[in-house]
Regions:
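Buried hydrophobic packing segments
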Residues: 97-100, 128, 132, 154-155, ...
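Residue-level signal for inorganic ion chemistry
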Residues: 8, 40, 59, 100, ...
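Generic hydrophobic/aromatic pocket-lining and core-packing "Φ" positions
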Residues: 56, 177, 212, 352, ...
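Phosphate-binding loop of NTP-binding sites
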Residues: 95-242
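Acidic, Mg2+-coordinating active-site environments of NTP-dependent enzymes
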Residues: 75-77, 83, 190-335, 357, ...
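N-terminal leader/targeting and accessory segments in enzymes
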Residues: 1-99, 376, 389-390, 394, ...
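Mobile, glycine- and charge-enriched loop segments
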Residues: 33-44, 138, 149, 153-165, ...
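Active-site beta-alpha connecting loops in nucleotide-dependent enzymes
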Residues: 48-50, 321, 340-399
Length: 399
């Protein structure tokens, strides 16, 4: 989706310096990922080790004309070297990025799945994508984009064709989830598991669990493991009033009761009862982590309309998440970047960006081997034009 620079100025409450007409389709926080400069809005973020304002002259030379800067931090905005550029001054570029993503999210009335937990977020998200994408256009977080910066960049990917959104939310200390909740606004919540990650920043496991559950305050339904005593206790204390979509190996009253799990060689067979109806699915993994993540993905997929028969077929075909952006050394000094597990336009851009950033690839010929991209929601002519644009921008030599 495109937004005019005038509308963005209003949405983030900025003071605009510059009067150049512009439309924005891409948000950028890392100068190395620049692809479409003429439609890019750069947010000059500051951290303890870096300052995005230092990259503005370089990005301007590369064609970027729209920048969000910290008020009083960048004093060259009126300089003639930045002709026909727009500078949007705000108190905090990070908060402006989050606010813009929040306003963008407001435009969509589709199921949005928010996924949080100490472990398994990415696996549940990616497997849900595989379970849902054969029949729905799914927009999801790239890689593990679950931070205060990654979440708004992910939500910005929501487009007119999106039918379901899948977004991760990760926190490391109290108070961080509020901003992510406002951006994602999940209609469906998934709590994967609790673990010791970042526990040093919380007084207790209960406090960490409550912080994570706060993501789902306004969700219509929350999926969680009711066998986890901490999670069950925190759910009761939270006062959550929506539908509780629990899964359990112990409680037959759970929304999804796992009756039995059989493990043979490399396949697990799970026998379950979902809302009173029995079903079975076969999973091509036997480790505990994969089995647990499959249950979380299954209960949400069933809730979203995947039939038990479809679930079994798609579960049996699940690919390991580790296949994402697999790098292999080929013959004659070439490097192979395999992203065949993913097949959508955003993943293609990420893979090409990954290729262009690798130091050993500088100066080498770049070849793109691509199958068709299904479930994009685009007309073929629009899709192939978009692929061609990406290939040209990322300097692919052979296609």
């Amino acid at each position: 989706m495109r937004y005019s620079i005038e509308k963005i100025t209003t949405l983030i409450g900025a003071r605009r310096i510059g009067e150049a007409e512009a439309n924005v389709s891409w948000l950028l926080t890392d100068s190395r990922s620049l692809c479409f400069p003429e439609e890019t809005l750069f947010f000059a973020l500051r951290s303890g080790r870096n300052d995005g304002h230092n990259y503005i002259p370089e990005l301007y030379r590369r064609g970027v004309r729209n920048f969000v800067v910290e008020r009083g931090r960048f004093r060259l905005a009126a300089d003639t070297q930045f002709e026909r550029a727009n500078f949007l001054e705000v108190v905090s570029p990070l908060e402006a990025l989050q606010r813009l993503a929040e306003r963008h999210r407001d435009e969509f009335d589709v199921p949005i799945v928010g996924i949080t937990g100490s472990n398994g977020k990415t696996m549940v998200k990616e497997w849900l994508y595989q379970l849902l994408s054969p029949q729905k256009v799914v927009t999801r977080s790239p890689k593990s984009y679950n931070s205060q910066i990654g979440v708004p960049l992910s939500v910005w990917l929501l487009g007119e064709q999106t039918e379901v959104g899948l977004f991760e939310a990760g926190i490391s200390q109290p108070g961080e989830m509020q901003a992510l909740r406002d951006i994602i606004q999940p209609t469906i919540g998934v709590l994967t598991s609790l673990g010791g990650a970042h526990q040093e920043n919380f007084r207790s496991m209960d406090e960490k669990c409550q912080e994570k559950l706060s993501l789902f305050h306004d969700a219509k339904v929350v999926a969680y493991n009711s066998d986890d005593n901490v999670v069950s206790r925190c759910m009761r204390k939270s006062g959550y009033r929506g539908e509780k979509l629990s899964w359990s190996k112990e409680d037959p009253q759970a929304a999804m009761f796992i009756k039995k799990i059989e493990r043979r060689e490399s396949i697990s067979t799970l026998y379950y009862i979902y809302k009173g109806k029995e079903g079975t699915y076969h999973l091509p993994f036997i480790d505990d982590a994969s089995v647990e993540c499959s249950i979380a993905a299954a209960v949400v997929a069933l809730y979203l309309g995947v039939t038990p028969e479809e679930l079994d077929v798609r579960m049996s075909q699940l690919e390991p998440v580790a296949m994402r952006l697999e790098v292999k050394e080929g013959q004659h000094g070439c490097t192979i970047i395999n992203d065949s597990y993913n097949s959508d336009i955003n993943s293609l851009d990420i893979a090409l960006d990954f290729m262009s950033r690798r130091p050993e690839q500088q100066g080498k010929s770049r070849t793109l081997i691509l199958s068709d991209i299904y479930q994009s929601g685009m007309m073929p002519q629009e899709l192939y034009h978009r692929v061609m644009e990406l290939a040209v921008k990322r300097r692919v030599n052979k296609f």
